[in-house]
Design a protein with these regions (language model features):
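Charged helix-capping and loop-helix junction motifs
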Residues: 21-23, 98-99, 123-128
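Short, flexible loop segments at boundaries between secondary-structure elements
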Residues: 134-150
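Structural beta-alpha unit
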Residues: 1, 75-109, 149-151, 155-164
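Short secondary-structure boundary segments
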Residues: 9, 42, 108, 112-114, ...
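Small/aliphatic-rich secondary-structure junction motif
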Residues: 2-57, 73, 77-79, 159, ...
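Glycine-rich, Arg-bearing micro-motifs that act as flexible, cationic patches
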Residues: 15, 108-130, 148-152
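General small-molecule cofactor/ligand-binding pocket signal
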Residues: 39-41, 82-86, 140
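A short acidic, glycine-rich active-site loop
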Residues: 56-65
């Protein structure tokens, strides 16, 4: 069995910390329980248009900064961790995350949900929703750290081959 946890993080300008912090804490706790290595992954989206390549997600190294901070915090907590940055075309973030999970033979993919709404699809967000439906390995979706107490448990999880 794999000894890796893939922690997928974003750096969305709207509020990059609450859901990322909650997911990182969950990955830290899982790693402490299992001794697994944590791979912190950020995927940049880009589009190619008439005038060349255009970055569509956060710029100015925000993604790299978030990854570096989380890796540093995990290591300070005694967890083995490394960071990775990948790029993909717009709309293919879930596929890129699953590709990295496959490459690293991750035991589980962990990510946070950034939405505040109660509508299930919007609650999870499009990337989280796609991961849950496409994954052939366990996926754990963690609510925002400021979510109501009723949502203190993971929002959704799969076991294997997309089972919930």
């Amino acid at each position: 069995m794999s000894k890796n946890i893939l922690l997928a993080v974003d750096a969305a300008p709207r509020d990059p910390t609450r859901h990322v912090v909650a997911a990182a804490a969950m990955a830290r706790d899982l790693s402490r329980d299992t001794g697994d290595h944590v791979i912190v992954l950020h995927v940049h989206e880009f589009a190619v248009g008439r005038f060349g390549r255009l970055q569509v997600d956060c710029g100015d190294g925000e993604g790299e900064g978030v990854v570096e901070t989380i890796v540093s915090d995990l290591r300070a907590a005694g967890v083995s961790a490394e960071g990775e940055i990948r790029e993909t075309h717009v709309g293919h973030v879930a596929t890129a995350i699953l590709s990295e999970a496959e490459e690293h033979d991750a035991r589980i993919v962990v990510l946070g949900s950034s939405s505040r709404t109660d509508l299930p699809r919007l609650l999870l967000g499009s990337v989280a929703s796609r991961l849950l439906h496409m994954a052939a390995r366990p996926v754990l979706i963690v609510p925002r750290s400021d979510a109501p107490a009723r949502a203190a448990q993971p929002l959704a999880a799969t076991t294997a081959a997309g089972e919930r």
